[in-house]
C-alpha cells in the first residue's frame, strides 16, 4: 500500500520525541515510548520471530525493501539539512507557506485506505533517527521546541484518527481476503487474460484436430520403430546362433579326423631294430656333410691366403691360367634392328640350371619383322603411340642443351673444359689408375 502524497510532503519531525503508534490486540492504536537498544552482532532482534514460514519470509523481504526505499530520500534530506541554522530556515519557510495556503483555501486531506506495517516501522525508524540528532538540537531555543512539539502532537492525533478509519475498512475486507488469497494466482492470470482480446471459440471435430493426428502418427511411428528393432535383434540372434552352430560342427569334424588318424596309426608291427639302423645312416650322412663343408671352407681360406701372398705378375699369370668360372653363363646373342631388350636380372646362383642358360636375346612378337625396310619416320620405338621415342638412335644426334649453364661461353666454362672436362681436351694418352698431379 503506497504512502499518501500529503504525508510525504510534510516536513520531517525534528524533535526529541521518543514515541511511536502501536496497535494492541484489540486493534486500538496508542503511543508508546521507544526504548533504544544497543545493536549486538549475531544476536536475534526482539522483533524477529523465532520461526517463520515462507510467506512470512517473503513479507519480511518486502518490508525490508520498502524500508530501504523510504530510507534513501530521508538520508538525502538529512544530509542536506545537517546545519541547524539551515534547518530552521527551511522549517520556517515551509510553515509560512502552509499558513498562507490555509488562509486562502481549504486543503482537502487525502483519505488513507490502509497503512502497512512497513510504514509504521518506517515512522519508528525516522523517530529513532531524530532521537540520534538530539545533541544537535541543543542550540534551538525553547520556544521553537514547544511549537514543534505541539505540531507533532496535532499530527499524531490526526494520524491516529486516520488509522482508526483504516481499521474499520480492514475489518470489512478481512473476511474476503481469506478466499481471495487462495485463488490469488488464478485471479492474477484472469486479470492478464482480460487485457488481451478474446476470440470466439470454434469447435473442431476430433478427427480433424491436428494435434491428435500428429500424436497418433507419432505413436504409430514409434511402435513401428520398436517392432523393427525387435525384428533386427531377432535376426542378429539367429545369425549368431547359426555361426556358433557351424563353428561347433567344424570342431567336431576336426576332432573326428584327429581320432581317425590316431586310430589308423598302428605301431604294433614296427621293428625297433630297423628304426635304429635308419637313424644311424642319417646321422652318418649328416656327419659326413658337416665334415665336407668344413673342409671346403678351410680350402677356400687357404686359397685366399695364397693369392694374397702372390706378387702382381704371379697373380696375373694365375688368373690367365685359371679363368673365372661363371655359374649359369648364358649365350650372348645378337639383337635385331629396333628389337626390344628384356633384362633378366642378376642374381647369385651357386648351382647350374639349364633353364638359366637359354638364349634370351631371341626376338618375340613384333621383333620378328624386319624394321629396316620401314620409312625413316617409322623407325622409332612405339610408333604411333603415346610412348614413342623421338630419335631412332642417339649416336648421330646432338642432344646438347644450349640453354643450360654448361652451354654458355664464359671464362669459367672455358677453363673447366680445357683443364678438367673429359673428352674435350687435346690429350690422347691412356689414363692411368693413379691421378696425376697437375701444376
Swiss-Prot record:
The modification Phosphothreonine is found at residue 267. Residues 71-81, 112-122, 131-144, 178-195 have a biased composition (Acidic residues). GO terms for molecular function: RNA binding. The modification Phosphoserine is found at residues 52-53, 94, 116, 118, 132-133, 361, 432. Keywords: Acetylation, Isopeptide bond, mRNA processing, mRNA splicing, Nucleus, Phosphoprotein, Spliceosome, Ubl conjugation. The modification N-acetylserine is found at residue 2. GO terms for biological process: mRNA splicing, via spliceosome. It is found in: Nucleus. GO terms for cellular component: centrosome; microfibril; nucleoplasm; nucleus; U2-type precatalytic spliceosome; U2-type spliceosomal complex. There is a cross-link at residues 67, 249, 357, 371, 381, 415, 418 (Glycyl lysine isopeptide (Lys-Gly) (interchain with G-Cter in SUMO2)). Residues 61-70, 145-163 have a biased composition (Basic and acidic residues). Residues 1-27, 39-200 are annotated as: Disordered. Belongs to the MFAP1 family. Involved in pre-mRNA splicing as a component of the spliceosome. Component of the spliceosome B complex. Interacts with PRPF38A (via N-terminal interaction domain). PANTHER family: MICROFIBRIL-ASSOCIATED PROTEIN. This is Microfibrillar-associated protein 1. The lineage of its organism: Eukaryota, Metazoa, Chordata, Craniata, Vertebrata. The gene is MFAP1.
Amino acid at each position: 500500500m503506497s504512502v499518501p502524497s500529503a504525508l510525504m510532503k510534510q516536513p520531517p519531525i525534528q524533535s526529541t520525541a521518543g514515541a511511536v503508534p502501536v496497535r494492541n490486540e484489540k486493534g486500538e492504536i496508542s503511543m508508546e515510548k521507544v526504548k533504544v537498544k544497543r545493536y549486538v552482532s549475531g544476536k536475534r532482534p526482539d522483533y524477529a520471530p523465532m520461526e517463520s514460514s515462507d510467506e512470512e519470509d517473503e513479507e519480511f523481504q518486502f518490508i525490508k525493501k520498502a524500508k530501504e526505499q523510504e530510507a534513501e530520500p530521508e538520508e538525502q534530506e538529512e544530509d542536506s539539512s545537517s546545519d541547524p541554522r539551515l534547518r530552521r530556515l527551511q522549517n520556517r519557510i515551509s510553515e509560512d507557506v502552509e499558513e498562507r495556503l490555509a488562509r486562502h483555501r481549504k486543503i482537502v486531506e487525502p483519505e488513507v485506505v490502509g497503512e502497512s506495517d512497513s510504514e509504521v516501522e518506517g515512522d519508528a525508524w525516522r523517530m529513532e533517527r531524530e532521537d540520534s540528532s538530539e545533541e544537535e538540537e541543543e542550540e534551538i531555543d525553547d520556544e521553537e521546541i514547544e511549537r514543534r512539539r505541539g505540531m507533532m502532537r496535532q499530527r499524531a492525533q490526526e494520524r491516529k484518527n486516520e488509522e482508526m478509519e483504516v481499521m474499520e475498512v480492514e475489518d470489512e475486507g478481512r473476511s474476503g481476503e481469506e478466499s481471495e488469497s487462495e485463488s490469488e494466482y488464478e485471479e492474477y492470470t484472469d486479470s492478464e487474460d482480460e487485457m488481451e482480446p478474446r476470440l470466439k471459440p470454434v469447435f473442431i471435430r476430433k478427427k480433424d484436430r491436428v494435434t491428435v493426428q500428429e500424436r497418433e502418427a507419432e505413436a504409430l511411428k514409434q511402435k513401428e520403430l520398436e517392432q523393427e528393432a525387435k525384428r533386427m535383434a531377432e535376426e542378429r540372434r539367429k545369425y549368431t546362433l547359426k555361426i556358433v552352430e557351424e563353428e561347433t560342427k567344424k570342431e567336431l569334424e576336426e576332432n573326428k579326423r584327429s581320432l581317425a588318424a590316431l586310430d589308423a596309426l598302428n605301431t604294433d608291427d614296427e621293428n625297433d631294430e630297423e628304426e635304429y639302423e635308419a637313424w644311424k645312416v642319417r646321422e652318418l650322412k649328416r656327419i659326413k656333410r658337416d665334415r665336407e663343408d668344413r673342409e671346403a671352407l678351410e680350402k677356400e681360406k687357404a686359397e685366399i691366403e695364397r693369392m694374397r701372398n702372390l706378387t702382381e705378375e704371379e697373380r696375373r699369370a694365375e688368373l690367365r691360367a685359371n679363368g673365372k668360372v661363371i655359374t649359369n653363363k648364358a649365350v650372348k646373342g645378337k639383337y635385331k634392328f629396333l628389337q626390344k631388350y628384356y633384362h633378366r636380372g642378376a642374381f647369385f646362383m651357386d648351382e647350374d640350371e639349364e633353364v638359366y642358360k637359354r638364349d634370351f636375346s631371341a626376338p618375340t612378337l613384333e621383333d620378328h619383322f624386319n624394321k629396316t625396310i620401314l620409312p625413316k619416320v617409322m623407325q622409332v620405338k612405339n610408333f604411333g603411340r603415346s610412348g614413342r621415342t623421338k630419335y631412332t638412335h642417339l649416336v648421330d644426334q646432338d642432344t646438347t642443351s644450349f640453354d643450360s649453364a654448361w652451354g654458355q661461353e664464359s671464362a669459367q666454362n672455358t677453363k673447366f673444359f680445357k683443364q678438367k672436362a673429359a673428352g674435350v681436351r687435346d690429350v690422347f694418352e691412356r689414363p692411368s689408375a693413379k691421378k696425376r698431379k697437375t701444376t
